């Protein structure tokens, strides 16, 4: 499924193991949309057993390409501590990164997370969001 780079795909489009295999191939070839959708699949347990660490891995691969939905998803993973150690600073960093990349849905989450943080931590997250991948061990 080499078209994955050019189409918007949702997990519901993957209905069997053969399609999942094709999608995995596209993700391994660097298709950010396929990487993001694999993150969603592992995050939600669609077709495969739910695996938050695997979800984080695939979201991070897509985020390396500035895929805004993956940046937002990473914010949620850090906010909830799903597959990673919970961190409001890293959650806010990813939400800021997604917002800067045009994902306006991040703004609500920015407000929610920032309300429970100290001003200096909010500022740190804002600074880190300029180059979020430098702040994450992959």
Please tell me what each predicted stretch does.
Residues 36, 57, 72, 92-93, ...:
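TPR/TPR-like alpha-solenoid signature
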Residues 28-32, 44-46, 51, 59, ...:
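Short helix-capping/linker turns of helical repeat alpha-solenoids
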Residues 106-138:
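Terminal, low-structured helical/coil segments at or just beyond the last alpha-helical repeat
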Residues 2-41:
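N-terminal segments that cap or nucleate solenoid repeat domains
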Residues 5-9, 35-44, 48, 73-80, ...:
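Hydrophobic face of amphipathic alpha-helices that form TPR/SEL1-like repeat modules
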């Amino acid at each position: 499924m080499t078209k994955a780079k050019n189409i918007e795909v949702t997990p519901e489009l993957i209905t069997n193991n053969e399609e999942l295999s094709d999608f995995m191939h596209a993700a391994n070839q660097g298709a950010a949309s396929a990487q993001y959708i694999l993150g969603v699949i592992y995050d939600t347990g669609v077709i495969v057993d739910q695996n938050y660490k695997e979800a984080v891995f695939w979201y991070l691969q897509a985020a390396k390409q500035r895929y805004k939905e993956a940046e937002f998803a990473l914010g949620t993973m850090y906010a909830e501590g799903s597959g990673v150690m919970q961190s409001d600073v890293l959650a806010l960093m990813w939400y800021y990164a997604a917002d800067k990349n045009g994902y306006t849905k991040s703004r609500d989450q920015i407000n929610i997370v920032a309300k429970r943080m100290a001003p200096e931590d909010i500022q740190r997250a804002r600074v880190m969001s300029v180059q979020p991948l430098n702040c994450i061990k992959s």
